[in-house]
A protein has these predicted regions:
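TRNA-recognition modules of translation machinery and tRNA-sensing kinases, especially anticodon-binding
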Residues: 1-219
Length: 219
């Protein structure tokens, strides 16, 4: 009986949400989140870019992801040389190569887009998820930590996150990253890195930078 009551309650809540979607918002919450984040980042002088969903194996190798890398088994391959992107970073590196030659520094860009991984770490992971990646490149090295914290605060505030933590964590791609965690349940909301970084060499990039990737569904 208790289960039936709970089920009835949850069904009622979901129907109310659907009715609210139709009568009030008329846009999915994730879409509204994207708009809020896009608007605030543009206001803060970041430029939105859009890159392809299909990624070449060559670009993955530039991220040190080869056939022996742990992430390889999580990739959705379309053929032997192309896959659905597991991350936004490779194409953003490619875009930054050109922008650094054309624009005055610092160069500030961001992208919001779908990424795909065969995740195997429980119910909190999905094969398709929406990432926000923002990068500021060409700033002074001594300002990196401060700027990273400013960007983390900007995004979390826009997303309505009232309590979060920043801590160091190991990464299969970057070696070590700085994670942004929900202050209540320690769920990872985003992951940040700073350069110069060893991965920069493959893209002929030498500038100091900060970058953060957020999972929008988690925000």
């Amino acid at each position: 009986k208790a289960f039936q009551q709970l089920e009835k309650k949850l069904v009622k809540i979901q129907r109310q949400k659907l009715q609210q979607l139709r009568d009030v918002h008329r846009r999915h919450g994730l879409c509204r989140q994207e708009t809020r984040l896009t608007d605030i980042l543009i206001q803060k002088d970041l430029v939105q870019v859009t890159t392809p969903t299909i990624l070449s194996k060559g670009f993955l190798s530039k991220m040190s992801i080869d056939d022996t890398h742990p992430l390889t088994s999580q990739i959705f391959w379309l053929d032997k040389d192309k896959c659905l992107r597991p991350m936004l970073a490779p194409h953003l590196y490619f875009v930054l190569q050109d922008l650094l030659r054309i624009w005055e520094k610092p160069v500030r860009i961001f992208e919001i887009g779908s990424c795909f991984r065969k995740e195997s770490q429980g119910a909190r992971h999905s094969n398709e998820f929406t990432m926000l990646n923002l990068v500021e490149m060409g700033l002074a090295e001594e300002n990196r930590q401060k700027r990273l914290e400013e960007l983390a605060a900007l995004v979390t505030k826009a997303a309505g996150v009232v309590d979060y933590l920043i801590q160091s964590e190991s990464s299969a791609v970057y070696g070590e990253t700085i994670d942004i965690l929900d202050g209540r349940n320690h769920l990872e909301l985003g992951s940040a890195a700073m350069g110069p970084h060893v991965l920069d060499r493959a893209w002929q990039i030498t500038d100091a930078w900060v970058g953060i990737g957020f999972g929008l569904e988690r925000l």
